[in-house]
Amino acid sequence: MILEGKTLAAAIRENLPARAQICKTKLGRPLKLTGIGWAADYASYVYLDKEIKAAEKTGITGEVIDITEQTSHEEMLNIIKKLSTDETVDAVIVPKPLPRHLNTLEIWEALNPLKDIDGSSVLNMGRLFMCKNWAEVEAMQGFAPATAMAVIKLLDFYKIKLSGVETGVLGRSATVGKPLAHMLSCKDATVKICHSKTPSLTSSLSQCDIVISAIGKAKFVTENMVKTGAMVIDVGTNQDENGVFCGDVDFENVKKITSAITPVPGGVGPVTLACLLENIIISGERKL
């Protein structure tokens, strides 16, 4: 089975324009998304442009503030602090990773968690990791990381059982791997985090009923890493040796032995964008 995400994404986005209009009427202004654009990271900048355009189609005002390698840490920190307190800004997107000369922790500490729609601020991360079960995740103030949430929503949409299921997460980034592993554990999955230092990586992954890859390496996951009948979720966004957009998984070969697999593009990606858009609306609705 192909676990495409476009149907779920469309369902999430269906009523967002109407909700945005209600917010506009009650607040006396349209909701506003401000993104920090770092053109040196081409992929991140292109995705930000996509987010801004999708927000504008939903009835949300979009704005981009560009930074460069010459933007000092103090300047960046002041931008974040200003956006965090600006009552006309409802949501803020910050590039990941940030330029290396910036103090990442201090930036994420300064970002208002109620505007942090991608769930990357220190406070949002802390709140998430304090959650012991899924009810607490759903009730938490702020937001959980959007890509990790998109994976959970996609699994729920296809009614894939998680409780007690051995699930391997390949990747331990703060952006996806670690928060996703915790969110899966809140869904009662038995979670195994695998990474570059995991001994016998193939053996470890091939024991799992669900394999989720989020490492950013084109076609890294091959059929010998996945047991027959397992489900595979591909979070990766890469280009192969021919410049073709692809995921972490060798899709054409791995799909032959899986019971279910997400494609790239068209799998987790559309759901992530839908989650981000919904989070903008939620941020606005909390002010009503």
UniProtKB/Swiss-Prot annotation:
Keywords: Amino-acid biosynthesis, Histidine biosynthesis, Hydrolase, Methionine biosynthesis, Multifunctional enzyme, NADP, One-carbon metabolism, Oxidoreductase, Purine biosynthesis. The keyword Transmembrane helix does not apply. GO terms for biological process: L-histidine biosynthetic process; methionine biosynthetic process; purine nucleotide biosynthetic process; tetrahydrofolate interconversion. It comes from the Bacteria. Its EC number is 1.5.1.5, 3.5.4.9. Pathway: One-carbon metabolism; tetrahydrofolate interconversion. SUPFAM superfamilies: Aminoacid dehydrogenase-like, N-terminal domain, NAD(P)-binding Rossmann-fold domains. PANTHER family: C-1-TETRAHYDROFOLATE SYNTHASE, CYTOPLASMIC (PTHR48099:SF5), C-1-TETRAHYDROFOLATE SYNTHASE, CYTOPLASMIC-RELATED (PTHR48099). Homodimer. Catalyzes the oxidation of 5,10-methylenetetrahydrofolate to 5,10-methenyltetrahydrofolate and then the hydrolysis of 5,10-methenyltetrahydrofolate to 10-formyltetrahydrofolate. This is Bifunctional protein FolD. It comes from Elusimicrobium minutum (strain Pei191).
